[in-house]
């Protein structure tokens, strides 16, 4: 009898230990992967320096083609255009941004589905000239987002301390390393706002080329700051405490390997673009796409009870 009682005690202890271990594993997110940060050299990082007017003229036809091949992009852009019309369509004075720039920011903030497709394409769109011309179907969005960030920064040039939580990826790096996100990256001025977007990695970032887009977002409460793909950061600090990664980055300039790519002759070789920091560039594996911040509302549908922007 005593032996039976002892077995029950041991079994109960085993079950409790298993339950505790299971809970701890859930908190650590078993689905997370480990990724080493790099300079994202496959990224399409065009800054369109000295070719803005020619790009606008060329993109008038490109946008029609892109809409026909990318339904998520087309639907989200139309919804963003409707929201622009509602907010600013009847203003008598010029806006801080031109219409297309404001719509691009609204579209980026509206749908995590389109954002994910866009970021995936942007991180690989710089592999070759042919890939960009024939396979990168976000040329218009990339151009107007880039121009919007430059315009907003010109009106208030300063640096911001921002935060970004990530679910599903534990990024690895080392102090002193130069890195880029290689995509348009959403961050927040409020640390508490990052918790809902994941805790496997926390980025604490000093950005000098990212700008607040609260005025041009479907979700102004997030206090979003959008960082461009060409900004270069130095890793100031890195820690990995029981599976929770914290990375501190400081802006050290900007670097693009491509410029005005759409205007180059077909079959032309890519030349090095605009560079403002001295970096030793070496080809390497491309960093997987940083997940888009989850949006409560999705541009291609919604869940019952979720708020939907009034323009839809």
Curated annotation (Swiss-Prot):
Catalysed reaction, written as an equation: L-arginyl-[protein] + NAD(+) = N(omega)-(ADP-D-ribosyl)-L-arginyl-[protein] + nicotinamide + H(+)
EC class: transferase
Active site: 164, 186, 224
Propeptide: 21-31, 267-312
Subcellular location(s) of the protein: Secreted, Extracellular space
Enzyme Commission number: 2.4.2.31
Pfam hit, one: ART
Disulfide bonds: 51-260, 159-208
Keywords: Disulfide bond, Glycosyltransferase, NAD, NADP, Nucleotidyltransferase, Secreted, Signal, Transferase, Zymogen
Signal sequence segment: 1-20
Residues reported to bind NAD(+): 108, 164, 183, 217
Cellular component aspect of the GO annotation: cytolytic granule; extracellular space
Entry keyword annotation includes ATP-binding: no
Domain TR mART core: 71-256
Keyword S-adenosyl-L-methionine tagged: no
GO biological process: response to antibiotic
UniProt cross-references to InterPro entries, sorted A to Z: ADP-ribosyltransferase_ARG, ART
GO molecular function: NAD+ poly-ADP-ribosyltransferase activity; NAD+-protein-arginine ADP-ribosyltransferase activity; nucleotidyltransferase activity
Family from the record: Belongs to the Arg-specific ADP-ribosyltransferase family.
Protein name as it appears in the record: NAD(P)(+)--arginine ADP-ribosyltransferase 1
Lineage start: Eukaryota, Metazoa, Chordata, Craniata, Vertebrata
């Amino acid at each position: 009898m005593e032996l039976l009682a002892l077995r029950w005690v041991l079994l109960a202890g085993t079950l409790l230990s298993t339950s505790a271990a299971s809970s701890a594993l859930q908190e650590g997110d078993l689905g997370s992967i480990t990724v080493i940060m790099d300079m994202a050299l496959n990224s399409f990082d065009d800054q369109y320096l000295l070719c803005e007017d020619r790009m606008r003229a060329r993109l008038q036809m490109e946008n029609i083609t892109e809409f026909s091949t990318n339904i998520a992009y087309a639907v989200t852009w139309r919804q963003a255009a409707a929201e622009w019309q509602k907010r600013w369509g009847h203003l008598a004075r010029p806006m801080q941004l031109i219409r297309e720039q404001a719509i691009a920011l609204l579209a980026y903030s509206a749908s995590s589905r389109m954002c994910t497709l866009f970021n995936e394409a942007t991180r690989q769109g710089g592999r070759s000239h042919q890939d960009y011309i024939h396979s990168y179907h976000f040329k218009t969005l990339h151009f107007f987002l880039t121009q919007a960030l430059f315009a907003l920064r010109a009106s208030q040039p300063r640096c911001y301390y921002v935060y970004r939580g990530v679910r599903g990826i534990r990024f690895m790096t080392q102090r002193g390393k130069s890195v880029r996100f290689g995509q348009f990256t959403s961050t927040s001025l409020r640390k508490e706002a990052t918790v809902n977007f994941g805790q496997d990695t926390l980025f604490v970032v000093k950005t000098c080329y990212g700008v607040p887009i609260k005025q041009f977002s479907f979700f102004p409460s997030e206090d979003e700051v959008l960082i461009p793909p060409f900004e270069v950061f130095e890793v100031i600090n890195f820690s990995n405490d029981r599976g929770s990664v914290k990375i501190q980055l400081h802006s050290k300039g900007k670097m693009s390997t491509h410029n005005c790519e759409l205007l180059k002759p077909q079959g032309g070789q890519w030349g090095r673009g605009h560079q403002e920091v001295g970096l030793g560039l070496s080809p390497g594996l491309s960093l997987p796409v940083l997940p888009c911040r989850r949006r409560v509302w999705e541009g291609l549908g919604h869940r019952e009870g979720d708020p939907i922007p009034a323009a839809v």
